[in-house]
From Swiss-Prot:
The gene is SNED1. Residues 352-374, 507-530 form the Follistatin-like domain. Glycans are attached at N145, N204, N292, N368, N408, N484, N536, N712, N886, N977, N1015, N1109, N1139, N1310. CDD domains: CCP (cd00033), EGF_CA (cd00054), FN3 (cd00063). Residues 1206-1226, 1394-1413 are annotated as: Disordered. Residues 1-24 form the signal peptide. Residues 1207-1217 have a biased composition (Basic residues). PANTHER family: EGF-LIKE DOMAIN-CONTAINING PROTEIN (PTHR24033), NOTCH 2 (PTHR24033:SF151). SMART domains: CCP, EGF, EGF_CA, FN3, NIDO. It is found in: Secreted, Extracellular space, Extracellular matrix. One of its GO terms (molecular function) is Notch binding. Residues 696-753 form the Sushi domain. Keywords: Calcium, Disulfide bond, EGF-like domain, Extracellular matrix, Glycoprotein, Phosphoprotein, Repeat, Secreted, Signal, Sushi. This is Sushi, nidogen and EGF-like domain-containing protein 1.
Length: 1413
């Protein structure tokens, strides 16, 4: 019995408290962190505004679809696909893609108070909290790990219509996802208002009443949704006391799937399964308040209450407008609209004219509540469907026949009668009033030419048939001649369309004479003559020629209303007013003829052999053949002629037609104007076109907004009539437009809306709103109706609660309450236990309008009507779920328990760790559960591994004897959630599992591809690699590392995956480095980053430093001696490469001496420019490594000016040096080329200047077979002229004598013994002498005779460098590049000593000879 009572008490507590089992709210400290200090963005302070579209960094799943953006709306709602600015909430479900998550959808106004914050969050603290919340509220998802959170917070916001001192609410929406599953959490701190004060919401000044806030979420398909209980009712003011997760003010849902899943603790007894308390299709939700089970009913649309037992009164929000009466239905309402309004909520103003159709341009008007058609002239009938017979009675006189027209008639008169009614003729007409032509009481007055009808007030027209419209605009006493037109009959002295112009002088009273005494008629300020029948009609108006406008005897020719003058000879001008100039001034006489004038003519006196009027005929007569056409006159000249063309023609033979206007192309009185090769016609009034051939046509007139249009034509004088639509009136300037002479219509009218509120139709203080063709009365409190003429029904506000019905009384109402409720408004609930509903001795307890039966032992149910089952005593406890079957029970154990009644705890493995990580696999190990008993229960382990994006999931079963496992076939660089469970097999094929031991592991990513070294300098090494778009999809970065052999560790740098190259800088020259690359997957610590296997070590030597301070120490005509800084001690250099480059070729010398600091380049040509490059070579295990070249530019000395000598008698020569500074290039010139020769012819010059050692020091132009002899010692530089044939080769240089009597034979280093052999020239020095050898000899004393022997050899040309590297036929691989082979001729030098041979002495001569060497 104790168990039954305990269970009943729990159920009683659940039913008594419902969703409000625990009072309270979520404190701000328990909200997810928010605010500006957290980096939140804030929505604009705008009524019904929001954040606009906010792109998301990860897609968010919602009802089976992924969304990449969302909107944070100020009105308490997060929406996908589109922004939601609607402020009055709509009951879920909603269609039309309204995908929304609404914590509190209401009319929020953040302009008055509060802020709306929002942000994305991926920081570890937020993700950890979100993960813990989801795992707690959804215990079946213990492997869930949040990767993204979105937080939106409405902080201290008030309602529309409120102020800064109005009540404020604070609530929050949290979105959570791991990329596959998604959840939302609602947090409510303080909810004190529910509704805005807008008319459609209906809230009061405190933010309560009307249509309250909606909470929940909606899929947007009109079917799938969830509404938090109490949505759109007054219960939303206490939503902070409700929950579905055991925390008052907090709701949690999973929202990624096609079906809604509601959160719960999952460890309490289900009240919903036991009682099923929700009615009318409401969904029951178990709350998990520890020790106090309760439930919440989520009602279908149209129902409310704790158990969804109350039908929502949709009329409470007063949806019917304009005085409509609301009738309540189930989840619906219907509005009965008053007269003049329609639509679902009586929102549309209606008029009797909406269904009335008037024909033939008739206008509908409302008169006394009915629609009446006001017809256009000529039509009648209820719908203007009948044409008025204007010929009844017959208005035509004197036997004329009447033809009926629309709104008019015309008379076909018999001879000799005419006039509008055939009233004019040759015979006296009887009294025209005898036929009583005037209608509607009009008085007929007989006139000379007929009759005139004087119409009574309200009528007009020729016969008083037409009713005067209310808006007749005729001025100065004018009468309107037709309805809906502005045609005025003006009184005497006025004219114009509206009789607006006064005639100051009557034209017919100013002695105006009409031809043959015709009758004068005033017309528009002018006059017209009505001629007698037998008078010529052309005299009805004066002729333009009547004033004799042509002078000097010119004749006038009239053309309609214009004229032209034909002038006599000698005059011209429009009126023949101008005299022509002297006839002879134009020189008409040809061929030297003399012109004489007489009597207005001229005469030509022709010279000999010419005749003719203009002396144009000669012999022979060229005009005899008649070459001039079109009447041209031929003038004869000697052997030729010229045509004098008549007016209008031109050309050599007058063959060119006249000007365009010559043929008078303009018709209908148009005036022609010549325009180059074309003409232009100035047309008379009423005509248009290129030749004035068409009458003026204005085309159809344009439409005017809010007006209908009628027009009688498009020609000159045609009239267009505009009639404003119902609800609009004419403003300016006129309703009539006239087709004007220049082919356009006159200014159009305007139709402006009529203010129907001007008459103040609303009664009892109601305010009037103007509408098109109508008005709307907004009634004051207590009145209603179209004009606020009715007193309001107090029951319309639905004051009765809990389903009570209202009865209206004069100035009051009374509520009839349903069973269970009493009070003035049925607000008090009666004791539900009065009916004794409990069976089998159950005790009834009431509360909150409901009751609960506390059942005795062995009975349960809502009324204790059901016999107890085996699960009543909860044999499975809180460790499993009990299932009854055939009087027995079975337990389905929860995670961590096993055994028959789930009484044994199943322990998980411990010390789960990672042993090895590879690209496609992971090795893990663990320890079995502690204790022999715990191990005895085990049947094995379940190893589950799931990829972080959920795309891969697998579970392996591992035998109990093993404590490690290899996870295979994994993707490279991918993160996996690994869970290991202890497993106990059951006989019912359902295994019990322990809580998991979890581990997050990531496989190694793939290494880079295509790694290579792209460039090496003395201080940098550049490398590049490639990442494949698919194979390296999980790679987030690349780590490049380098190590010097003497360094203790690598120097590593991480670069982004988008980078594919890197340069190591600040390296030491000539050193060996080791380079390796690895890829990285996952950068942050929480992502468990891994690194790929490194690439194979790549050894790279940096280049050695190039030679420093390269300079030219000495430059001669054929050699250059260069020096540079010696290598530092310990240098690994093994050789140098010297490149000699001209503009045509490059030669290289390989010098295998790494300690070299100078080098002499020989075999150069005098006066040439060279580029010298020196490259240092270092030997490595990878082959020779070369430095960058050091460059030097030189110009060799010319022959003359390098070394100058003069040989005199027995004295030894003294060499004068002309050596330039080492840093400058030599600039050698011909010594004696400064003065011009004495004779005009330049004498031949020598071709070479040879020094004492037989070396060419300068080359010049000249004859190669000539020589110059210098006869005496020059006082200045010798001028080498007077070239002679030389009998033999002489190798001498210019020599100068020694000065003084000093004995130079004993000077050290002198040349007194002439030690040089083979013609070598001795050069004395300070301490020693040197020999300057001739061609073909070498050695210190020129003792070696050398010859060069050619032989074929192979030269290698670099594909990347332009210069081959070779020395004496031996190729040196200076660059580690690809070479191509080229066959060439090389020279090998062979030398032989001549010391045993006697060298002939040189013969001294008093004269010195210079010869080509």
């Amino acid at each position: 019995m104790r168990h039954g009572v305990a269970w009943a008490l729990l159920v009683a507590a659940a039913l008594g408290l419902g969703a409000r089992g625990v009072r309270g709210a979520v404190a701000l400290a328990d909200f997810y962190p928010f605010g500006a200090e957290r980096g939140d963005a804030v929505t604009p302070k705008q009524d019904d505004g929001g954040s606009g579209l906010r792109p998301l960094s990860v897609p968010f799943p919602f009802f089976g679809a992924e969304h990449s953006g969302l909107y944070v709306n100020n009105n308490g709602i997060i929406s996908f696909l589109k922004e939601v600015s609607q402020f009055t909430p709509v009951a879920f479900p909603i269609a039309k893609d309204r995908c929304v998550v609404a914590a509190f959808w209401a009319d929020v106004d953040n302009r008055r108070a509060g802020d709306v914050y929002y942000r994305e969050a991926t920081d570890p603290a937020m993700l950890r909290r979100a993960t813990e919340d989801v795992r707690h509220y959804f215990p079946e998802l213990l492997d869930f790990n949040a990767t993204w959170v979105f937080v939106a917070t409405w902080y201290r916001v008030t309602f529309f219509g409120g102020s800064s001192s109005s009540p404020v609410n604070t609530f929050q929406t949290v979105l959570i996802t791991d990329g596959k599953l998604s959840f939302t959490i609602f947090n409510y701190e303080s909810i004190v208002w529910t509704t805005g004060t807008h008319a459609s919401s209906g809230g009061n000044a405190t933010g309560l009443g009307g249509i309250a806030a909606q909470a929940g979420f909606n899929a947007g398909d009109g079917q799938r949704y969830f509404s938090i209980p109490g949505s759109r009712t007054a219960d939303m003011a206490e939503v902070e006391t409700t929950t579905n997760v055991g925390v008052p003010g907090r709701w949690a849902f999973r929202i990624d799937d096609a079906q809604v899943r509601v959160g719960g603790c999952g460890h309490t007894t289900s009240v919903c399964l036991a009682l099923r308390p929700c009615l009318n299709g409401g969904k029951c939700i178990d709350d998990c308040v520890t020790g106090n089970p309760s439930y919440t009913c989520s009602c279908l649309s149209g129902f409310t209450g704790r158990r969804c037992h109350l039908d929502v009164n949709e009329c409470a929000s007063q949806p019917c407008q304009n005085g409509g009466t609301c009738t309540h239905g189930i989840n619906s309402f219907r509005c009965q609209c008053p007269a003049g309004f329609g639509g679902p909520t009586c929102e549309t103003a209606q008029s009797p004219c909406d269904t009335k159709e008037c024909q033939h341009g008739g206008q509908c008007q409302v008169e006394n509540g009915s629609a009446v058609c006001v017809c256009q002239a000529g039509y009648t009938g209820a719908a203007c469907e009948m044409d008025v017979d204007d010929c009844s009675p017959d208005p035509c006189l004197n036997g004329g026949s009447c033809v009926d027209l629309v709104g008019n008639y015309t008379c076909l008169c018999a001879e000799p009668f005419k006039g509008l009614r055939c009233e004019t003729g040759d015979h006296p007409v009887p009294d025209a009033c005898l036929s009583a032509p005037c209608h509607n009481g009009g008085t007929c007055v007989d006139a000379d030419q007929g009759y005139v009808c004087e119409c009574p007030e309200g009528f007009m027209g020729l016969d008083c048939r037409e009713r005067v419209p209310d808006d007749c605009e005729c001025r100065n006493g004018g009468r309107c001649l037709g309805a809906n037109t502005t045609l005025c009959q003006c009184p005497l002295g006025f004219f114009g369309l509206l009789c607006e112009f006064e005639i100051t002088a009557m034209p017919c009273n100013m002695n105006t004479q009409c031809p043959d005494g015709g009758y004068c008629m005033e017309h528009g300020g002018s006059y017209l003559c009505v001629c007698h029948t037998d008078h010529n009609a052309s005299h009805s108006l004066p002729s333009p020629c009547d004033s004799d406008p042509c002078f000097n005897g010119g004749s006038c020719d009239a053309h309609d209303d214009s004229y032209t003058c034909e002038c006599p000879r000698g005059f011209h001008g429009k009126h023949c007013e101008k005299a022509r100039p002297h006839l002879c001034s134009s020189g008409p006489c040809r061929n030297g003829g003399t012109c004489k004038e007489a009597g207005g003519e001229y005469h030509c006196s022709c010279p000999y052999r010419f005749t003719g009027r203009h002396c144009e005929i000669g012999k022979p007569d060229s005009c005899a053949s008649g070459p001039c056409h079109n009447g041209g006159t031929c003038f004869h000249y000697i052997g030729k002629y010229k045509c004098d063309c008549p007016p209008g023609f031109s050309g050599r033979h007058c063959e060119i037609a006249p000007s365009p206007c010559f043929r008078s192309p303009c018709v209908n009185g148009g005036t022609c104007e010549d325009r180059d090769t074309d003409f232009f016609c100035h047309c008379q009034a009423g005509y248009m076109g290129r030749r004035c051939q068409a009458e003026v046509d204005c085309g159809p007139p344009e439409e005017v907004k809010h007006a209908t249009l009628r027009f009688n034509g498009t020609r000159l004088g045609a009239v267009a009539l505009y009639a404003c639509d119902r609800g609009y009136s004419l403003s300016a300037p006129s309703r009539i437009r006239v087709c004007q002479p220049h082919g356009v219509w006159s200014e159009p009218p305007q139709c402006l809306e009529i203010d129907e509120c001007r008459s103040q139709p609303c009664l009892h203080g109601g305010s009037c709103q103007d509408r098109v063709a109508g008005y709307l009365c907004l009634c004051s409190t207590g009145y209603e109706g179209a004009h606020c003429e009715l007193e309001r029904d107090e029951c319309r506000a639905h004051p009765c609660r809990n389903g009570g019905s209202c009865r209206n009384l004069p100035g009051a109402y009374v509520c009839r309450c349903p069973a269970g409720f009493v009070g003035v408004h049925c607000e008090t609930e009666v004791d539900a236990c009065d009916s004794s509903p409990c069976q089998h001795g159950g005790r009834c307890e009431s509360g909150g309008g409901a009751y609960l039966c506390v059942c005795p032992e062995s009975f349960f149910g809502y009324h204790c009507e059901t016999v107890s089952d085996p699960c009543f005593s909860s044999p499975c406890g809180g460790r499993g779920y009990c299932l009854a079957s055939n009087g027995s029970h079975s337990c389905t154990c929860k995670v961590g328990y096993t055994g028959e009644d789930c009484a044994k705890e199943l322990f998980p493995p411990t010390a789960l760790k990672m042993e090895r990580v590879e690209e496609s696999g992971v090795s893990i190990s663990w320890n079995p559960p502690n204790g022999p008993a715990a191990r005895q229960m085990l049947d094995g382990y379940a190893v589950t591994y799931v990829s972080s994006d959920g795309s891969y999931r697998r579970t392996d079963f591992v035998d109990r004897t093993r404590s490690s496992h290899q996870l295979q076939a994994l993707a490279a660089g991918r993160a996996y959630n690994i869970s290991v469970f202890s497993v106990k097999r059951n006989s019912n094929n359902k295994n019990d599992i322990s809580r998991p031991a979890v581990l997050l592991a990531r496989t190694r990513p793939r290494p880079v591809e295509g790694f290579e070294v792209t460039n090496v300098t003395a201080s940098t090494i550049s490398v590049q690699w490639a990442l494949h778009r698919i194979r390296h999809a999980t790679v987030s970065g690349v780590r490049v590392s380098i190590r010097h052999p003497e360094a203790l560790r690598d120097q590593a740098t991480d670069v982004d995956r988008s980078v594919d190259r890197f340069t190591f800088r600040a390296l030491l020259p000539g050193k060996r480095y080791t380079i390796q690359l690895t890829t990285l997957s996952g950068l942050r610590g929480e992502e468990h980053p891994t690194e790929s296997l490194a690439t194979a070590p790549t050894h790279v030597w940096t280049r050695p430093l190039p030679p420093a301070n390269l300079t030219a120490a000495r430059v001669t005509a054929t050699s250059a001696h260069v020096v540079w800084d010696a290598p530092t001690p310990g240098s690994l250099l093994e050789a140098y490469v010297i490149n000699v480059t001209t503009s045509q070729s490059t030669k290289s010398r390989y010098v295998p001496n790494g300690k070299l600091a100078s080098y002499t380049v020989r075999d150069l040509l005098p006066g040439r420019r060279y580029q010298l490059s020196v490259i240092a070579v270092q030997s490595t295990e990878l082959g020779p490594q070369h430095s960058e070249p050091a460059h030097l530019y030189i110009i060799t000395s010319p022959r003359d000016g390098a070394d100058r000598r003069w040989h005199q008698g027995g004295h030894h020569p003294r060499v004068l040096k002309n050596r330039p500074p080492p840093a400058r290039l030599p600039e050698l010139r011909l010594l004696n080329d400064h003065s011009a020769p004495e004779t005009p012819t330049q004498p031949p010059r020598f071709s070479e200047l040879v020094d004492g050692r037989g070396r060419v020091s300068a080359r010049f132009g000249g004859s190669p077979s000539k020589a110059a002899t210098v006869r005496s010692q020059p006082t200045a530089s010798a001028q080498l002229e007077n070239m002679e044939e030389a009998p033999k080769r002489v190798s001498l240089a210019l020599q100068l004598p020694e000065h003084g009597s000093k004995d130079i034979g004993n000077v050290p280093g002198n040349c007194s013994e002439n030690p040089c052999q083979n013609g070598g020239t001795c050069v004395p020095g300070a301490d020693a002498h040197s020999c300057d050898c001739g061609p073909g000899f070498k050695g210190r004393r020129c003792e070696l005779a050398c010859i060069k022997v050619s032989r074929p050899c192979t030269r290698l040309f670099s594909e990347t460098k332009a210069f081959p590297v070779w020395e004496g036929g031996v190729c040196h691989h200076v660059y580690k590049r690809v070479y191509r082979v080229h066959q060439d001729i090389c020279f090998k030098e062979s030398c032989e000593s001549t010391s045993l041979k006697k060298t002939p002495n040189r013969k001294q001569s008093k004269s010195q000879t210079l010869e080509k060497s």
